Amino acid sequence: MENLHQHLSEALKQLRQANGWSLTLAAERTGVSKAMLGQIERGESSPTVATLWKIATGFNVPFSFFIQGNGLQSGESARFSQPNAQMTVRPLLPYDAQLRFDLLAVELAAGAQSDSSPHESGCVEQVVVIEGELLLGMRGVWRRLQAGEALQFAADVAHSYRNPLAAPLRFHSLIHYLKRP
């Protein structure tokens, strides 16, 4: 996990510098505080999945940009967990720049909820429940999905994933970035 946090730190710093952004500008573009971005860059803080999504959206890079890379061992790049371990995400395939999608395996702890800020404009997400039950909330409406069921939705609005059961929830998320170059 140490290498993953080091990778996150280096990836964020490299991305910010490649864009020529100050920490202040990066904070404005991502919606993540300047202090938090600085702590992540220095390896002093581990971001939540939601924070990492905000950063990826603000920099217009796929989520998997931060959890895959040359500086990681294959086992380490396979999982990214929030500090409180309520949600774990791992890429099933590397980001496909031609097709512009991420395919992720997600696990949500028993009784947990994860709230997601809107992804970039035009982003579409498809979820397939593998095990358990998923409550997917958007604009105050919750949809219930059982194992084997799937749903496609516009991910450019705030949305939430909730596990109502006393056992872990596992689902796959295919995120299609329609406007990404």
Where are the regions a protein language model picked out?
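A short glycine-rich, His/Asp/Glu-containing loop-to-beta-strand
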Residues: 79-117, 173-178
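Short alpha-helical DNA-recognition segment
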Residues: 20-38
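Ligand-binding loop in jelly-roll beta-barrel domains
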Residues: 99, 147, 155-181
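DNA major-groove recognition helix of helix-turn-helix/homeodomain DNA-binding modules
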Residues: 50-65
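A short, Lys/Arg-rich alpha-helix, primarily the initiator
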Residues: 1-18
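Short, conserved beta-strand element in jelly-roll/cupin
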Residues: 108, 120-136
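Short acidic-glycine-tyrosine-enriched beta hairpin
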Residues: 139-154
